[in-house]
Amino acid sequence: MGIVTSRFNAGSLRQIKLCLIAAPMNAVDFASLLCSRLCHDLMSPVGALNNGIELLADETDPEMREKCLELLADSARATANKLKFFRLAFGAGGGFADEIDTGEAQAALEGLFGGEGKVQLGWVVSDEKLPKGAIKLLLNLSLLAGDALVRGGQLDVGAERRTGEIELAVRAEGPRILLDPVLRQTLATGGSGTIEPRAAAAWLAHHLAGEAGGTIKLSDPTSDVLMIGAVIPA
């Protein structure tokens, strides 16, 4: 048993065999799904930018104008952080190299979850670089676990490269954890029927692991702590 797995209390994890007989989805379908997810996530900070600009145009009080500028800065930062994360997790971020700097992945996660201060990030990755597929899988698992912390909490993210394999583990703990059953099913089996935009990360994580010849692990739905992991060939 690896260092990462034992650190994340792997004894309570149940292994789920990846089922590759899920409903097929072509590239156009997935592109549409992903675009819907990105638009949904960017709507709030971009909308706040628009509101801030409108307020600034009508406001003459110096103090209120200063607050408008602060709102604009916060919204612009949130938008940029989301785009940086999505580029690495969903797109071709990291260039065309086979491996990606893990520090870039850490910075992307810190930018995504660190702004509001609701989620505290623990980074347990010692390797300076990991394969691009492993980084994408780790980020998508982290996104799912972080979103499940509806009232905030602790999100620990770990990875370990061993001989012949790479082990990834994400642990979420907080006052309320909610991983939607649809997301859980999509993550474990690839889903069935029409996949919703909110399940884009789960669908991608499932297929990233499956195409790499790996397995996915999930903690029991009744557990007080959410743990998601994967083991893929190095």
Show where each model-derived region lies.
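Conserved short strand/loop->alpha-helix "switch" segment adjacent to the catalytic nucleotide/phosphoryl-transfer site
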Residues: 26-33, 118-146, 150, 191-194
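Conserved ATP-binding N-box helix of the HATPase_c
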Residues: 32-51, 59, 133-159, 203-208
